[in-house]
Amino acid sequence: MTLENKKILVAGLGGTGISMIAYLRKNGAEVAAYDAELKPERVSQIGKMFDGLVFYTGRLKDALDNGFDILALSPGISERQPDIEAFKQNGGRVLGDIELLADIVNRRGDKVIAITGSNGKTTVTSLVGYLCIKCGLDTVIAGNIGTPVLEAEWQREGKKADVWVLELSSFQLENTESLRPTAATVLNISEDHLDRYDDLLDYAHTKAKIFRGDGVQVLNADDAFCRAMKRAGREVKWFSLEHEADFWLERETGRLKQGNEDLIATKDIPLQGLHNAANVMAAVALCEAVGLPREALLEHVKTFQGLPHRVEKIGKKNGVVFIDDSKGTNVGATAAAIAGLQNPLFVILGGMGKGQDFTPLRDALAGKAKGVFLIGVDAPQIRRDLDGCGLNMTDCATLEEAVQTAYAQAEACDIVLLSPACASFDMFKGYAHRSEVFIEAFKAL
């Protein structure tokens, strides 16, 4: 991709946008910056980093009318808006940081493991990265997991990696056309971001863009959307919690298997829950696809301790166990967390629902939940969607109130689970802040 002397507008000035500005300027592009709401202190801060950088704010159309060749979008900005559609129709190109990285790794020959899905993608990305490092590969872990890919590339000063392990969101995949992963997975599809996509099929089609090229596909045999993503002529590795597959769970023995070969007992996996058994199978399949030995992978799986805020036990009070799954920001994630826990539950739900339908939680909660505590702006919708299913639902003004009320109703061996099925920004700075408040409320009991 030729960037020299191209006139490029970078839209969105978070970490990804800043990394794109740095990369594009280094490669000779004429770069300007845009943000819909641009505070003077932010202009000053970024201006100190990039001498002579021109800033635009207000309407995106007005900025684009200045003769730009390329619009480089941060993932939080949808390209499905009239101003951007008109820009493309007039010959402009729209891309993001993943497309820029794809150009780099394609030229250099770096291997890429790419991971997406509605739920589990951060856990699988972390596990795959951990396994690659433990097996001796020079590994870069980047993308939606936290470090922007071009920032990671900048830190490496152009040095080729043995493997890039990329967590990719649907937002990042929207304008990615050239990425050709060595191995890739869509872990699952459930309702998420339906405030951005036309419907669930539209969302699934965007996720499936991760399978461009001819690399190994790792697919969830239990998910109808994932089954439909199989590409003709491609090597596919299937994983399943329900029936025999390339990688599968033998329920009677509680062991993961590869075909007929025994792999590992679920009790030897530090990660809790059946959904994490699926995550381990996907991770091992991805790592094998880049040539890592199975025996070493399984040994290292036993030492991976997982991530904070993902079905994480934070403590026990008078026999009542408190579990933090603040990262459960959609219905599918919360349903998986509930399915993976055995004891009776009191579940804290609510926040910003992102246009989801919460009725699938009726089946997930049935027979397991003793009570539900609702918080946040979309608590009324959750109550409507769950109404009539026989659950005792309590509205709480704060997360602290929900923790106190749940604890007052719980008995020894019960679980109080924070798994909101919603984003957090109506009440908190993010899911990590929500987790901190939950933990402090537990400590205050």
Curated annotation (Swiss-Prot):
Catalytic function, reaction form: UDP-N-acetyl-alpha-D-muramoyl-L-alanine + D-glutamate + ATP = UDP-N-acetyl-alpha-D-muramoyl-L-alanyl-D-glutamate + ADP + phosphate + H(+)
Alphabetical keyword list: ATP-binding, Cell cycle, Cell division, Cell shape, Cell wall biogenesis/degradation, Cytoplasm, Ligase, Nucleotide-binding, Peptidoglycan synthesis
Chain segments annotated as coiled-coil in the UniProt record: none
Localization (cell): Cytoplasm
Cited InterPro entries: Mur-like_cat_sf, Mur_ligase_C, Mur_ligase_C_dom_sf, Mur_ligase_cen, MurD
Gene Ontology molecular function, alphabetical: ATP binding; UDP-N-acetylmuramoylalanine-D-glutamate ligase activity
EC number(s) recorded for this UniProt protein: 6.3.2.9
Pathway recorded for this protein: Cell wall biogenesis; peptidoglycan biosynthesis
GO annotations of cellular component type: cytoplasm
GO biological process, one term: peptidoglycan biosynthetic process
Enzyme class: ligase
Major location (coarse): cytoplasm
The keyword Cytoplasm is assigned to this record: yes
Keyword match Signal: no
Top-rank taxon: Bacteria
Annotated ATP binding sites: 117-123
HAMAP family cross-referenced by the UniProt entry: MurD
Purpose: Cell wall formation. Catalyzes the addition of glutamate to the nucleotide precursor UDP-N-acetylmuramoyl-L-alanine (UMA).
NCBIfam families assigned: murD
PANTHER family referenced in this protein's UniProt entry, alphabetically: UDP-N-ACETYLMURAMOYLALANINE--D-GLUTAMATE LIGASE
Family designation: Belongs to the MurCDEF family.
Protein's name according to its UniProt entry: UDP-N-acetylmuramoylalanine--D-glutamate ligase
Organism: Neisseria meningitidis serogroup C / serotype 2a (strain ATCC 700532 / DSM 15464 / FAM18)
